[in-house]
Amino acid sequence: MWRVKVLINTQAKLFILGIIWDLDNDVLKCCTNFDSLTCEVKITKRLVLSTVQKVFDPIGMLAPSTLLPKLLLQEIWKMKRAWDQELPQNIVNKFMKWFNEIQILKGISVPRCMKIDIFTELHVFVDASKGSYAGCVFARSIVDSRVSVILVRAKSRVAPLKLLSIPRLELMACCVGARLVNSILKALNMPDLKVTLWSDSTTTLWWIKEYGNWSVFVANRVKEIRQLTQIQSWKYVPGNMNIADLLSRGCSPRQMLSSRWWEGPSWLKQNS
């Protein structure tokens, strides 16, 4: 214990599993400081992949902006380019735009410690687009007589190369959300917290809440969702009020700065 105290008192920042812990402000940050790329550097599939992997973000605080290069990578894979073959200029332009902007997110942080009690609510938002599907979890608490909403965790996944319908991708997003909130409840050891899961897909909500002769694809995922969550906890949210829309479509780092991503939707802060 003595050694730990000495370390905390002598360093302003620590690295915890690749995440920066700012001790002065007790917040967590992601490292986005990369070596600069000059115009002489050849942009290849290997370089894009290695750069994307350098953003270690297990919480998902930067997930909307880190989705863009992942979608770009899938586009590169479809081209069947060699690892060290120079990429087309339109791909290079997209990558460099993201690379130059990602640096502005180095100051983004989330509180390390969240005040969780028996009155805390977990709100899960899920969504999908043609290129990806995603889920995110926000904790809603009353702190000093004020409503506090904070991002707990988020995850986005690139859609499979095999073409799937939007409703099926939305169902996969529901699986992501169910797994996320289930892991959070286990980590907190508070299984009785109120959980609400929000989707803007009426089709997937129908699959989850009703019983029918679904296809194997739908049936397997509905079964998992029902095992991890309560059916009555799933609710509809209009698309323009679904914060996961930002996560499933992705956005540039600059757009992300002006969004409500870390605060959650404004309506969630209204008194019940």
List PLM regions with ranges:
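Acidic, metal-ligating active-site segments
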Residues: 16, 124-149
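Mobile genetic element proteins and their domesticated derivatives, centered on retroelements
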Residues: 18, 52, 56, 60, ...
